[in-house]
């Protein structure tokens, strides 16, 4: 970001200077109305673009962003690429429940997905649950409007068939909205449109509960 702005904010927040903290200059600003592609192609001197460049050049291990989600995803896709055999990136959100934390994937990266993309989401979500949440054999559920196999739209029905036959996925079947907060599986798979609605609804319910 802009060094002068960052240093001023650090002073206001009483954050001390440290040799472990390096400010990397970046002077362009990604507006929330920018498209993700325009933000990456036209604003190469933005903080998100510079941050992803640092990971690409092995000068950083990870990027944390509270800004434009589309720009962060697009920059990562263009500069870092995806894992082998993964066609599209996905956003994984760690969600709470009464019993345990679980992975929601996709939480908004791809509003329009094909069944194969959701299977890839299940594989990525399972890997995250296994290595980060410590679940030995993560249980995977598919978000639908009913637990029966015949329930759901065309995307859900075809995805369900693929999940049942894909090695490496511990698929437990379809789940419904009320399952999310009581006893959800370790990984909940859905398209980005549905996942983003779930995420935003959860945020609003939390805000209401605090009032």
Say what each PLM segment does.
Residues 77-90, 94-104, 182-211:
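Glycine-rich phosphate/nucleotide-binding loop
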Residues 1, 24, 65-67, 94-95, ...:
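Short beta-strand segments
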Residues 4, 111-177, 186:
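Glycine-rich phosphate/diphosphate-binding loop of Rossmann-like nucleotide-binding domains
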Residues 1-8, 13:
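N-terminal phosphate-binding or glycine-rich loops at protein starts, especially the Walker A/P-loop
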Residues 21, 102, 169:
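Short, conserved active-site loop motifs that form the nucleotide-linked donor/cofactor pocket
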Residues 28-29, 68-70, 78, 145-148, ...:
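Short glycine-rich anion-binding loops that position phosphate/pyrophosphate groups of nucleotides
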Residues 6-7, 45-58, 62-76, 83, ...:
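Short glycine/serine/threonine-rich phosphate/pyrophosphate-binding segments
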């Amino acid at each position: 970001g802009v060094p002068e702005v960052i240093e001023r904010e650090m002073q206001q927040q009483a954050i001390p200077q440290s040799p472990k903290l390096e400010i990397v200059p970046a002077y362009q600003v990604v507006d929330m109305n920018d498209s993700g592609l325009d933000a990456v192609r036209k604003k190469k001197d933005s903080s998100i673009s510079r941050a992803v460049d640092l990971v690409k050049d092995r000068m950083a291990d990870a990027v944390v962003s509270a800004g434009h989600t589309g720009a962060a995803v697009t920059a990562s896709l263009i500069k870092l690429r995806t894992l082998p055999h993964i066609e599209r990136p996905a956003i994984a959100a760690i969600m709470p429940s009464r019993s345990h934390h679980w992975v929601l994937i996709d939480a908004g990266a791809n509003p329009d997905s094909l069944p194969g993309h959701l299977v890839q989401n299940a594989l990525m979500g399972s890997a995250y649950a296994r290595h980060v949440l410590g679940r030995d054999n993560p249980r995977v559920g598919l978000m639908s409007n009913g637990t029966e196999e015949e329930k759901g739209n065309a995307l859900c029905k075809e995805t369900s068939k693929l999940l049942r036959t894909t090695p490496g996925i511990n698929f437990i079947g379809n789940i419904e909205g009320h399952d999310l907060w009581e006893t959800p599986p370790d990984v909940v798979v859905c398209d980005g449109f549905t996942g983003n609605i779930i995420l935003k609804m959860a945020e609003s319910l939390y805000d209401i509960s605090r009032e």
